[in-house]
């Protein structure tokens, strides 16, 4: 039993014990309630960052808490190991992605163990291993057979530098988010999965996600984007072709003055054949940024095609324009334009001098001036012939019915969600298991040829994927015929869409999942990860779960019961200007600062003696060189201190500001806890607690102990406000200082320290492990039981009332909790110390705060 708290000697020994005992190995137990806790698995980039530490500490706290509450806990870990960064690193370091990835996995695995995270390492998986992606390939072929997979040529964002397709979200200012290369538009064949077949269910089931943050649910609803509207068909003057549009505002239909079409629309391409100027404009549009989020702010450009659409209801001819804000891969690639009642249409019409026709006015207002600005609210129709006077819904129904009766319209439900393009033109990913035969027929790779292995011993030239460059790799046979493998690889969101399920049976080789194990553990009870994954990973995982269900592999509808989105970790960022005026960012660990009385930085100097500029607290990032190395912090302060700071400094879902003084404060608290426990134990074995024999003061301390147990249990288990739980424990420790050294004081201290150690154990498990032994407990704290608040102890039978005379304290009374004001006054007036100050005075007024204060006003 060492007197000083030295985490560097404690923590490795405790971790070794956990490893040897396989403390956190999970097995299916029917006699215990299961709890599956999962943090989003990391990409093996090489080193953990503080964002990882926060995510995984939160998950570990929840897991350990549930284990102490008698649950059978599964907390696995693995590696989201495919992806472009490995290719870039391989090129930079003159190696192949595979060895770079495997080395990083080993290094980061040791870092995770150093943090004391209670994982079942026997379930570790890496998505780049064939025994993982084999089943992903198998499942893809089954989806193909069910008609849920198809291939089509589509316009994509193409990064010519990385030779890959980019999602709209990966294009920033018309450049690649990774390498800043200008993005081009390119037509290529791609594989898609029909997520739109599940759009309605994905939307409706959001209502069942009771344990998810409202913000994430709202983001998914908006991303799926269900709308009710009308598909309308316009005849084209002089042609047999028709132009299809979709609108959610058929009430504005009589205000259509032009039709906008995408640059890639067949009518645009047809018109361009005889119009070189239009052809050049279409080419310009094809290489314009197409992120939907930027459509509202981008400059609107267009050109007339010379074609005219015929308005189905009034026969008017309206011009057809190619417009850069109309996207071919959204909807029909054409829009009806109502500049009087749509901001974008108005901006375009004003720029090009097109007609602006008002057809909606406020219910109780004047006619809108639509020449200056579009009137976008709903209202009453005018200027609309037989539909004049109708409000929105009656107008919607009447115009939709009229169009349907004429055979040129149909009510329809539309979704913003598009099918999931899973093809990637990169190497380090799972090969897509499809074959093309000599006659062009496309077939899935037969099951006995799976997995389609990705060769790992490759040379990266930075230009083309090695499997695209290697003609021999693509060659294979199918039923004796020559066949060629698909050389695209899967979007890495494929791997992360089902990994949570594979953890249930990671070594199962008879199928994608062992249904018994999967249905024992799933759904995940608690999932932890960043809110940036709300609309991609979390939606794809929900979709995949429904696919697994419909394949008979799982019997639940949703993958994750409860979701916690942790906030970012921020740190101070410092820079100085170089000779060219550029910012040179300096690590905060290399900067000494001076602060004012409010803690604000007033001066900062780096290790070179150079004064640097403080740019504020920003997200830890490589670009600003303000990441704090978790390994360095663990080596300096210990894992428990880092974990305690992470859980205490901020609510879990809010941003966390890194603070050296905060970390030091966390370590001071742990040292104090160690010292108090050591002193308590050094005085000998504590006697048994006799609740009936406790004094008023001892009862008050015990009441605070059990109130704290109740609060911490609720804060950690239900509310997940871990910072307030820690604050309550710290306050309790201050109250324990009131205890003396008599037998019942020591007995009460023993009860309190045992409770404190167990309550802190999920957050600071190493010191908890040692202090539990120090307190003389036989079993490991890993198998202890979470303390239960004693309801009787929390009942206040007595209150301490302060007695004041004319606002000055003159005495204290211990009174029954339910005493009346009259009885308190009698006791006060009978108290000698009070009488001394009231003799000869007349009581004018009595102010009573029940159970706390009695103020007698007398003169």
From Swiss-Prot:
Catalysis: reaction(s): tRNA(Leu) + L-leucine + ATP = L-leucyl-tRNA(Leu) + AMP + diphosphate
InterPro entries (alphabetical): aa-tRNA-synth_I_CS, aa-tRNA-synth_Ia, Leu-tRNA-ligase, Leu_tRNA-synth_edit, M/V/L/I-tRNA-synth_anticd-bd, Methionyl/Leucyl_tRNA_Synth, Rossmann-like_a/b/a_fold, tRNAsynth_Ia_anticodon-bd
GO terms for MF: aminoacyl-tRNA deacylase activity; ATP binding; leucine-tRNA ligase activity
Enzyme Commission number(s) of this protein: 6.1.1.4
Alphabetical list of PROSITE patterns matching this protein: AA_TRNA_LIGASE_I
Residues the entry annotates as binding ATP: 622
Location in the cell: Cytoplasm
Residue interval(s) of motif 'HIGH' region: 42-52
Pfam families given in the database record: Anticodon_1 (PF08264), tRNA-synt_1 (PF00133), tRNA-synt_1_2 (PF13603), tRNA-synt_1g (PF09334)
Catalytic class of the enzyme: ligase
Gene Ontology CC: cytosol
Superkingdom: Bacteria
Motif ('KMSKS' region): 619-623
Principal place of residence: cytoplasm
Keywords: Aminoacyl-tRNA synthetase, ATP-binding, Cytoplasm, Ligase, Nucleotide-binding, Protein biosynthesis
HAMAP family: Leu_tRNA_synth_B (MF_00049_B)
Annotated family: Belongs to the class-I aminoacyl-tRNA synthetase family.
PANTHER family assigned to the protein according to its UniProt record, in alphabetical order: LEUCINE--TRNA LIGASE, MITOCHONDRIAL (PTHR43740:SF2), LEUCYL-TRNA SYNTHETASE (PTHR43740)
Name by which UniProt lists this protein: Leucine--tRNA ligase
Organism listed in the record: Aeromonas hydrophila subsp. hydrophila (strain ATCC 7966 / DSM 30187 / BCRC 13018 / CCUG 14551 / JCM 1027 / KCTC 2358 / NCIMB 9240 / NCTC 8049)
């Amino acid at each position: 039993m060492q007197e000083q708290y030295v985490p560097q000697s404690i923590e490795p020994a405790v971790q070794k014990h956990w490893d040897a005992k396989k403390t956190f190995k999970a097995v299916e137990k029917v006699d215990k309630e299961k709890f599956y806790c999962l943090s989003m698995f990391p990409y093996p980039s090489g080193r953990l960052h503080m964002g990882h530490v926060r995510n995984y500490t939160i998950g570990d706290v929840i897991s350990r808490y549930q284990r102490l509450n008698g649950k059978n806990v599964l907390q696995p870990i693995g590696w989201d190991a495919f992806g472009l960064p490995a290719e870039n690193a391989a090129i930079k370091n003159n190696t192949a992605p595979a060895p770079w990835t495997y080395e990083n996995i080993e290094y980061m695995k040791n870092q995770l163990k150093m943090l004391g995270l209670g994982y079942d390492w026997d379930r570790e998986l890496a998505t780049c291993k064939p025994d993982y992606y084999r089943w992903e390939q198998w499942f893809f072929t089954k989806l193909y057979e069910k008609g849920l997979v198809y291939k089509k040529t589509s316009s994509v964002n193409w990064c010519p530098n990385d030779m890959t397709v980019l999602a709209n979200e990966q294009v920033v200012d018309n450049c690649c988010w990774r390498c800043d290369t200008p993005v081009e538009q390119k037509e290529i064949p791609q594989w898609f999965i029909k997520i739109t077949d599940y759009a309605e269910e994905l939307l409706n089931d959001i209502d069942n996600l009771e344990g998810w943050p409202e913000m994430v649910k709202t983001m998914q609803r908006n991303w799926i984007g269900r709308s009710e509207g009308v598909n309308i068909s316009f005849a084209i003057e002089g042609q047999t072709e028709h132009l299809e549009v979709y609108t959610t505002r058929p009430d504005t239909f009589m205000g259509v003055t032009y039709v906008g079409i995408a640059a890639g629309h067949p009518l645009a391409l047809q018109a361009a054949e005889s119009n070189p100027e239009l052809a050049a404009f279409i080419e310009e549009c094809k290489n314009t940024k197409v992120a939907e989020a930027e459509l509202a702010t981008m400059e609107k450009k267009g050109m007339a095609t010379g074609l005219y659409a015929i308005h189905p209801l009034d026969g008017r001819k309206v011009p057809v324009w190619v417009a850069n804000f109309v996207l071919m891969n959204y909807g029909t690639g054409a829009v009806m334009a109502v500049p009087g009642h749509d901001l974008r249409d108005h901006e375009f019409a004003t720029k090009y001098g097109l007609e602006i026709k008002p057809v909606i006015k406020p219910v109780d207002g004047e006619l809108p001036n639509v020449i200056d600005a579009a009137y976008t609210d709903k209202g009453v129709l005018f200027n609309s012939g037989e539909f004049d006077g109708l409000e929105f819904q009656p107008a919607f129904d009447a115009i939709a019915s009229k169009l349907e009766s004429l055979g040129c319209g149909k009510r329809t439900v539309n979704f913003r969600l598009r099918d999931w393009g899973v093809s990637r033109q990169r190497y380090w990913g799972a090969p897509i298991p499809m074959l093309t035969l000599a006659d062009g027929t496309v077939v899935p790779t037969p099951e006995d040829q799976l997995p389609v292995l990705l060769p790992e011993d490759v040379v990266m030239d930075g230009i083309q994927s090695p499997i695209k460059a290697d003609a021999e790799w693509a060659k294979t046979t199918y039923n004796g015929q020559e066949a060629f493998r698909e050389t695209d690889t899967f979007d890495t969101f494929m791997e992360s869409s089902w990994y949570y399920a594979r953890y249930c049976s990671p070594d199962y080789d008879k199928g994608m999942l062992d249904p018994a194990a999967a249905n024992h553990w799933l759904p995940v009870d608690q999932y932890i990860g960043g809110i940036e994954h709300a609309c991609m990973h979390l939606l794809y995982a929900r979709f995949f779960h429904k696919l697994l269900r419909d394949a008979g592999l799982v019997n639940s509808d949703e993958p994750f019961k409860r979701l916690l989105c942790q906030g970012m970790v921020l740190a101070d960022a410092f820079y100085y200007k170089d000779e060219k005026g550029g910012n040179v960012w300096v690590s905060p660990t290399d900067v000494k600062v001076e602060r004012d009385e409010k803690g604000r930085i007033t001066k900062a100097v780096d290790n070179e003696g150079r004064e640097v500029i403080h740019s504020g607290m920003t997200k830890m990032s490589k670009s600003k060189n303000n990441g704090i190395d978790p390994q360095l912090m663990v080596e300096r302060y210990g894992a428990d201190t880092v974990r305690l700071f992470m859980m205490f400094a901020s609510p879990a879902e809010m941003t966390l500001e890194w603070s050296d003084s905060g970390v030091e404060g966390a370590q001071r608290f742990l040292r104090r806890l160690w010292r108090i426990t050591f002193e308590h134990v050094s005085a000998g074995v504590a006697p048994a607690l006799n609740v009936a024999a406790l004094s008023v003061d001892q009862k008050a301390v015990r009441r605070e102990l059990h109130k704290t147990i109740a609060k911490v249990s609720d804060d950690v288990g239900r509310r997940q406000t871990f910072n307030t739980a820690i604050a309550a424990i710290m306050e309790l420790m201050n109250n324990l200082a009131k205890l003396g050294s008599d037998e019942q004081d020591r007995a009460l201290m023993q009860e309190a320290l045992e409770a404190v150690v167990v309550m802190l154990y999920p957050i600071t498990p190493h010191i908890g492990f040692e202090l539990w032994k120090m307190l003389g407990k036989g079993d490991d704290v890993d198998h202890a039981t979470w303390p239960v608040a004693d309801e009787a102890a929390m009942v206040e039978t007595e209150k301490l009332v302060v007695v004041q005379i004319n606002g000055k304290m003159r005495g204290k009374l211990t009174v029954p909790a339910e005493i009346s004001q009259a009885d308190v006054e009698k006791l006060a007036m009978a108290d000698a110390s009070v009488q001394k100050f009231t003799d000869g005075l007349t009581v004018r007024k009595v102010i009573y705060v029940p159970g706390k204060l009695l103020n007698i006003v007398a003169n």
